[in-house]
């Protein structure tokens, strides 16, 4: 007997397909809007919060907030949109209460806000910086869509749904599943919640949806390209201005897009001279402002050329993690990160293993630190699943869309430590091709593993990459340093290599013999061998050791780690430096001095 014939069927109790209608994934890179420097109204603050371990909210339709039947008689209810416990947004729920520390599942956020139109025909958009992982949006009881991806922004238009008083509900689910990027098995903490800003934007009926401005990467340094997409208009004219260059140029809009090419020779952005220009674009009264640096990053043989000159990437890897804030960041915390990298003598940072806060690239533009940005195609995701690819590609495109105008971003990474299978090769090659097609101004890489049978840098994916990322842990997971030497000798890459990960765990302040694991002395010994390795092989053009700060991860539970990966050059307090910090610092300052002398 089917459900229609079953006379005691209760949909909210018996329908296990309840989630299908809420899984549209319609909030994606195509719905993102340009928000930089636009006026906004913050919806941050105290929200009502309810854990929903059984997904009752979707099953029973909590967004409908029904407390009376059709005859007006009162009904019992299991959820209070306006009476749940209060939680700050942005934040991670894991740090809110001890019992939420390892919670994975759905949770409902709710708050009211007032709205009064300020201009005729204005359009209103809700923008969320990030929510981990599946976020479903409800406004005044109506489902507007959902977004996959725990680290990228998303936008939804709410214009037609608003009244004077409005109820916004967001159901966030951080459950790890096999068909997503990342999948169930990772090596970082699975924070849940809305942990970046929630904002409203009021826009004109026709507005600039996206604007990309860059220096054409043809090695001539004299041509600026602007690609502009508009919404609410198919034709018209876009005006582009760069006042400091005395430039004003217009372009025609055709089918919602305009392309403008300007002959100009701007001062170039570099780590030594992080020059940024104000750029303005205008369409039918909608005027936006960008800060853009102009630079070129190219590969020539085994060398990386930045603005035409060979460069060595003196970097370090970083997780988005804080013992007190989780994945939420503050400007103070981020600026401390950049100060530590500068103190190291660094010019480069690898943002692992997912898109970090957009503030990172904004500050990097300002202070002159180059960035490697990555999507969480991590370890053994389901490379044969079309839905998994769609998820990964969308996260890549959202990241590129968000950070396209950031001069500091020089590398898009399409994954980390993935086995060299046929399915993975096809999956990640397509991602690399997508990145190159959408963004010709940057390089593409991935963090690859060593061929441990041949002791060689060998991965079929490298054919699709501009730079080879190499993750190796000789001295730690593989204690024989002779194998590190053989790896270097056996490898004959035709492209530049970055040692994207290497290192060792160490308890800050714990001392012992150089052979004793988890001691300062052992970590120093690993770094000395690794620095010597990098010096000896000229195809290595950079390194981002693992990593700047210790971070939380449930995989690491021995007596020393106690829930933390301890490979940080600085402890989880982000203050106490380990001795290996100074080993790397000495190497980087030497490289920096050599580069300065060669210019």
What are these language model-derived features?
Residues 85-115, 119-139, 145-148, 180, ...:
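Active-site-adjacent substrate/metal-binding segments within catalytic domains
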Residues 1-94, 171, 177, 528:
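Accessory carbohydrate-binding/adhesion or oligomerization-edge regions at the termini
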Residues 42, 102-104, 119, 149-151, ...:
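Surface-exposed coil/turn segments at beta-strand junctions on protein surfaces, enriched
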Residues 161-165, 229-298:
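Extended acidic/polar, glycine-enriched regions
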Residues 225-227, 338-339, 348-590:
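Substrate-binding/catalytic cleft of secreted carbohydrate-active enzymes
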Residues 205-232, 588-599:
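Surface beta-strand/loop "capping" patches
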Residues 42, 106-112, 123-125, 153, ...:
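Intrinsic-disorder/low-complexity, polar/charged segments enriched in Ser/Thr/Lys/Arg/Asp/Glu/Gln
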Residues 3-5, 14-19, 28-29, 34, ...:
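Accessory beta-strand-rich segments of carbohydrate-active enzymes
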């Amino acid at each position: 007997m089917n459900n229609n014939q079953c006379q005691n069927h209760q949909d909210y109790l018996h329908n296990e397909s309840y989630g299908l209608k809420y899984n549209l994934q319609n909030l994606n890179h195509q719905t993102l809007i340009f928000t930089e420097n636009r006026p906004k109204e913050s919806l941050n603050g105290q929200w009502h919060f309810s854990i929903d371990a059984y997904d009752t909210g979707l099953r029973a339709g909590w967004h409908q907030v029904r407390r009376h039947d059709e005859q007006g008689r009162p009904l019992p209810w299991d959820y209070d949109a306006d009476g749940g416990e209060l939680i700050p947004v942005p934040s991670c729920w894991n740090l809110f209460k001890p019992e939420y520390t390892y919670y994975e599942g759905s949770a409902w956020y709710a708050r009211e806000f007032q709205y009064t139109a300020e201009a005729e025909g204005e359009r209103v958009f809700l923008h969320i910086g990030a929510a981990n992982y599946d976020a479903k949006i409800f406004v005044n009881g109506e489902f507007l869509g959902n977004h996959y991806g725990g680290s990228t922004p998303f936008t939804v238009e709410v214009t037609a749904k608003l009244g004077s008083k409005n109820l916004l509900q967001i159901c966030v689910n951080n459950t790890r599943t096999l068909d997503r990027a990342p999948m169930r098995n990772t090596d970082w903490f699975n924070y849940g919640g809305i942990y970046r800003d929630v904002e409203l934007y009021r826009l004109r009926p026709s507005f600039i949806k996206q604007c990309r401005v860059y220096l054409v990467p043809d090695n001539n340094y004299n041509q600026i390209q602007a690609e502009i997409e508009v919404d609410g208009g198919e034709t018209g004219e876009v005006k582009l201005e760069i006042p400091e260059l005395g430039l004003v140029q217009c372009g025609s809009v055709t089918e919602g897009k305009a392309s403008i090419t300007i002959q100009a020779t701007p001062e170039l952005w570099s780590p030594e001279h992080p020059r940024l220009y104000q750029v303005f674009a205008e369409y039918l009264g909608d005027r936006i402002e960008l800060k853009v640096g102009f630079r070129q990053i190219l590969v020539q043989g085994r060398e990386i050329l930045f603005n035409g000159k060979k460069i060595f990437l003196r970097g370090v890897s970083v997780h988005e993690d804080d013992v007190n804030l989780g994945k939420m960041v503050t400007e103070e915390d981020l600026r401390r990160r950049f100060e530590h990298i500068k103190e190291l003598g660094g010019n480069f940072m690898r943002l692992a293993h997912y898109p970090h806060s957009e503030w990172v690239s904004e500050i990097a533009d300002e202070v002159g630190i180059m960035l490697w940005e990555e999507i969480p195609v991590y370890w053994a995701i389901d490379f044969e699943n079309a839905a998994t690819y769609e998820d990964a590609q969308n996260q890549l495109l959202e990241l590129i869309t968000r950070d396209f105008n950031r001069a500091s971003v020089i590398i898009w990474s399409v994954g980390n430590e993935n086995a060299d299978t046929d399915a993975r090769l096809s999956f990640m090659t397509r991602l690399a091709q997508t990145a190159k097609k959408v963004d010709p101004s940057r390089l593409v890489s991935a963090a690859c593993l060593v061929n441990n049978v041949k002791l060689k840098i060998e991965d079929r994916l490298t054919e699709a990459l501009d730079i080879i990322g190499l993750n190796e842990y000789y001295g730690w997971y593989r204690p024989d340093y002779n194998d590190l030497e053989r790896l270097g000798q056996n490898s004959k890459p035709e492209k530049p290599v970055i040692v994207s990960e290497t290192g060792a765990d160490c308890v800050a302040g714990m001392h012992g013999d150089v052979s004793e694991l988890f001691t300062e002395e052992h970590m120093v010994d690993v770094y000395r061998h690794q620095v010597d390795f990098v010096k000896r092989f000229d195809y290595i053009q950079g390194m981002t050791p693992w990593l700047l700060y210790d971070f939380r991860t449930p995989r690491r539970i021995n007596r020393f780690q106690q829930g933390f990966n301890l490979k940080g050059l600085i402890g989880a307090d982000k203050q106490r430096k380990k001795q290996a910090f100074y080993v790397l610092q000495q190497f980087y300052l030497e490289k920096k001095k050599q580069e300065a002398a060669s210019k």
